[in-house]
């Protein structure tokens, strides 16, 4: 019986281990080749399995991937949730268990509809089904498109495909390569290993192609203020003005910058409470021919709260006034951090479901760019930068930069902020726009239009990042078309693989 049990569990156990290794493909490890190998191993592991067996093998792979890959979430739950260890572990386990459903859905559907390891099934059907599972994970329950495999390729030759089809195209190519490797191993057809080699070589060739044109005449000096404010102290009334003056003093030392940028919710107060201060800040910035952008919390007249971005100084908005129509309001809210699903049930259960600032309202999906010192910027607050379609639709022909403000202090010295920066870099590469990322305690950085970090400052330090950024003109194919070509490719791939299966079985 023990032998039978071991025989039944050995593939799921192996899959969990392989899934956990997938984290090595992402920041901070960035062994990008791992993202090609681990899905190939998953395809090999489910070869010959029943649908039910494949489902559990895929589930184990996903459990391993997310247990290691999003371990940083536990830092926030344990540090700020106010619950005992058992409750913290239960919540973390529940999140991992939920996310593992999507790899399980992939393996089950593959074995259900395309069980045979044919070339068409592995090169067309498997990548298409993987993308469908990714899209569902990025949409269901507001979505969590973290650890999409394509993000791991930001520094690989495949990165050159991102301006053409976005991070999803990179994921597709990884799965095509993984399918070829699986086919080679299963059928001992080693010539199929040429397929991932050709994909990587093509990516290298594309790296010399520029889809957009830099505009050196519009080069801009920016100063990013990293306040390094302790998250446990930030919202204490006694710390309000020390925090505000910290950012103010650091800004005074950098008035020669064209744009000064503070992080998400840098001002620990409602905007309506600070009209005199903000009016004086606006005047000082104008006097120094500069502009300041900051994250701030807002409350509308109807009582709704918003996580917002405001700009003062040299802006098209005139002298400072409390006008919420001239602010950017975060649209994609963080579950449990900024809104609580089923809050009437969950809020009474534990402090974690009743965190401060966890009752925000959404802004519109598409909003006007923030304009500072003549430069339009497409904003994304923290978690929003992981939603590629939202960022894409907020970039216009006039947009000079991508702007993301964040506060990753919730996640301490974990790998979370490093993965977050990796995702932000992908947005710059996809859209051909330089990226400005201002955070409370890191990673504060700026990238060029290829997603390469050109300046950064260390985490967990009070510091100012000075840099010069050059806007670009033009649109990448991904900016113009979005994911529609991939939707069509997925539909055609599944149709062709299904037609070939039916014809073979006839």
Swiss-Prot record:
Annotated PROSITE patterns: CN_HYDROLASE
One of its GO biological process terms is: lipoprotein biosynthetic process
Any stretches that span the bilayer, and where are they? 26-46, 66-86, 89-109, 113-133, 166-186, 192-212, 479-499
Is Ubl conjugation one of the keywords? Answer: no
List the membrane topology term(s): Multi-pass membrane protein
* Cell compartment(s), UniProt: Cell inner membrane
Kindly indicate whether the keyword Transmembrane helix belongs to this entry.
Answer: yes
Q: What is its main location?
A: membrane
> Catalytic residues per the record?
264 (proton acceptor), 330, 382 (nucleophile)
- List each copy of the CN hydrolase domain by range: 225-471
- Superkingdom is Bacteria
The cellular component terms of Gene Ontology attached to this UniProt record, alphabetical and capped at eight, are: plasma membrane
Q: What is its EC number?
A: 2.3.1.269
Q: Which keywords label this protein?
A: Acyltransferase, Cell inner membrane, Cell membrane, Membrane, Transferase, Transmembrane, Transmembrane helix
Q: Which GO terms describe its molecular function?
A: N-acyltransferase activity
* Pathway in which this enzyme or protein is active: Protein modification; lipoprotein biosynthesis (N-acyl transfer)
Record CDD domains: ALP_N-acyl_transferase
Q: Which SUPFAM superfamilies match?
A: Carbon-nitrogen hydrolase
The record's similarity note reads:
Belongs to the CN hydrolase family. Apolipoprotein N-acyltransferase subfamily.
Q: What's this protein's function?
A: Catalyzes the phospholipid dependent N-acylation of the N-terminal cysteine of apolipoprotein, the last step in lipoprotein maturation.
Protein name stated in the entry: Apolipoprotein N-acyltransferase
What organism is the protein native to? Vibrio vulnificus (strain CMCP6)
At the highest ranks, the source species' classification is:
Bacteria, Pseudomonadati, Pseudomonadota, Gammaproteobacteria, Vibrionales
């Amino acid at each position: 019986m023990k032998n039978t049990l071991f025989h039944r569990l050995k593939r799921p156990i192996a899959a969990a281990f392989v899934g956990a290794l997938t984290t090595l493909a992402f920041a901070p490890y960035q062994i990008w080749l791992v993202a090609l190998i681990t899905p190939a191993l998953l395809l090999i592991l489910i070869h010959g399995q029943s649908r039910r067996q494949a489902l559990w093998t895929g589930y184990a792979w996903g459990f391993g991937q997310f247990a290691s890959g999003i371990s940083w979430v536990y830092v926030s739950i344990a540090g700020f949730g106010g619950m005992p260890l058992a409750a913290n572990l239960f919540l973390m386990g529940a999140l991992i268990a939920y996310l593992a459903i999507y790899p399980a859905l992939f393996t089950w559907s593959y074995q259900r509809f395309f069980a045979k390891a044919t070339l068409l099934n592995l090169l067309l059907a498997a990548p298409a089904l993987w993308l469908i599972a990714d899209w569902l994970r990025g949409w269901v329950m507001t979505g969590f498109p973290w650890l999409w495999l394509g993000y791991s390729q930001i520094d690989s030759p495949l990165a050159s495909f991102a301006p053409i089809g976005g991070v999803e195209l990179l994921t597709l190519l990884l799965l095509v390569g993984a399918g070829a490797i699986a086919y080679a191993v299963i059928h001992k057809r080693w010539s199929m290993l040429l397929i991932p080699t050709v994909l990587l070589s093509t990516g290298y060739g594309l790296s010399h192609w520029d889809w957009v044109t830099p505009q050196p005449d519009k080069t801009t000096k920016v100063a990013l203020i990293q306040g390094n404010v302790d998250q446990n102290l930030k919202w204490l009334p006694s710390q309000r003005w020390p925090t505000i003056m910290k950012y103010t003093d650091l800004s005074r030392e950098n008035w020669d910058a064209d744009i000064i940028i503070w992080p998400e919710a840098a001002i620990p107060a409602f905007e309506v409470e600070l009209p005199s201060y903000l009016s004086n800040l606006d005047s000082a910035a104008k006097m120094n021919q500069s502009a300041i952008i900051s994250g701030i919390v807002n409350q509308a007249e109807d009582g709704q709260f918003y996580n917002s971005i405001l700009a003062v100084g040299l802006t098209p908005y005139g002298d400072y006034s409390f006008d919420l129509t001239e602010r950017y309001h975060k649209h994609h809210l963080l579950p449990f951090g900024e809104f609580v699903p089923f809050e009437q049930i969950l809020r009474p259960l534990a402090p974690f479901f009743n965190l401060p600032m966890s009752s925000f309202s959404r802004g519109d999906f598409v909003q006007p760019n923030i304009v500072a010192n003549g430069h339009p910027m497409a904003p994304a607050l923290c978690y929003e930068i992981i939603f590629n379609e939202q960022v894409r639709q907020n970039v216009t022909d006039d947009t000079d930069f991508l702007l993301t403000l964040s506060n990753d202090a919730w996640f301490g010295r974990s790998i979370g902020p490093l993965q977050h920066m990796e995702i932000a870099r992908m947005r710059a590469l996809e859209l051909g726009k330089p990226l400005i990322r201002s955070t409370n305690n890191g990673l504060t950085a700026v990238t060029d239009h290829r997603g390469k970090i050109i300046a950064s400052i260390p985490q967990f330090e009070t510091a100012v990042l000075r840099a010069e950024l050059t806007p670009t003109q033009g649109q990448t194919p991904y900016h113009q078309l979005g994911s529609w070509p991939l939707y069509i490719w997925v539909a055609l791939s599944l149709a062709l693989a299904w037609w070939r299966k039916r014809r073979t079985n006839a």
